[in-house]
């Protein structure tokens, strides 16, 4: 089957790789000059299945009000005047219940754990290198309230059989020796030894090269204008003056997916703006070993070979990609507070990207009401974590194979159905 994939971020490239491996003839189209040059370019560098959780959580609405008055708040909202933004925020609010949080987190962990299995198999088969580390990830808490609040996440981890370690402030240095200097600031931590880290952009670039070896064709610097429809199916992709045709089409355009398919299917994928800095390491002994997540500021600090990536925060501001100095200041403050002297933040590069977020946190993977149109989008902050599993899942669905995990509650139909009350998230 001839398949056109729109988007060459980590999710699009993973989709291409697994579809090609399943025997399909695949073409990837992207407006950028190469793979992973937009949202996947400088993310936090985590592969964290155990930390897969929706932003829509109990207590978040009240926290959001408090964060409005904080200098280093992890969430900021600026109304853009669109109905879609208001609808999306209302849908997210309706998912901030204990019941829906547990349901949504369970789905996310299921896909994320499967995706890590797929990544490990890929690494064993191809020996792909991307500055990867398998030292786990550590979430650190600055207050007893945060430590106590981890109980609901631990319950989900237990149910999903995800290994974890609950550490005291003195035990944190066992996982991250450099934290010994600041242990007095911390009350404890939650460590997931099975999580991994690495450079997502490097991974995507090298996976694209592996996909090319399987026959995948990449068309970069190519504008994507519209999907042409005929007879109730997609007839082609309008790329400037050219119509690109195939048997099936996959939209993996992240936050840009929503507008492209708007006339065919309504999907609640909104751009959640995030930031990162990448600083050179100046003292390895004072730098992190793997990834440390600061629960207070919702910031991840990740060790690469000779660099530290610091990423996080969320702004609900539409497609505004302006870099804000205040956000850089928060990232620098956080890494210098936990790992003083580890990296040179004065020489750090500064970046922003738009995470494609659904109101329930779960991505949209699978079929649509249009017979030959498929979606692989809405992964939020977990694009890399879920990429391989989403790609393999989609390849199985498009090849007529039964997926290795449950997939029906990952498709867009969970938003469209009026009868699937148990697994249908709030969507007005």
Curated annotation (Swiss-Prot):
Oxidative deamination of D-amino acids. Belongs to the DadA oxidoreductase family. HAMAP family: DadA. GO terms for molecular function: D-amino-acid dehydrogenase activity. Keywords: FAD, Flavoprotein, Oxidoreductase. InterPro entries: DadA, FAD-dep_OxRdtase, FAD/NAD-bd_sf. FAD binds at residues 3-17. Pathway: Amino-acid degradation; D-alanine degradation; NH(3) and pyruvate from D-alanine: step 1/1. It is an enzyme of class 1 (oxidoreductase). Its EC number is 1.4.99.-. GO terms for biological process: D-alanine catabolic process. GO terms for cellular component: cytoplasm; plasma membrane. It catalyses: a D-alpha-amino acid + A + H2O = a 2-oxocarboxylate + AH2 + NH4(+). Its cofactor is FAD. The lineage of its organism: Bacteria, Pseudomonadati, Pseudomonadota, Betaproteobacteria, Burkholderiales. This is D-amino acid dehydrogenase.
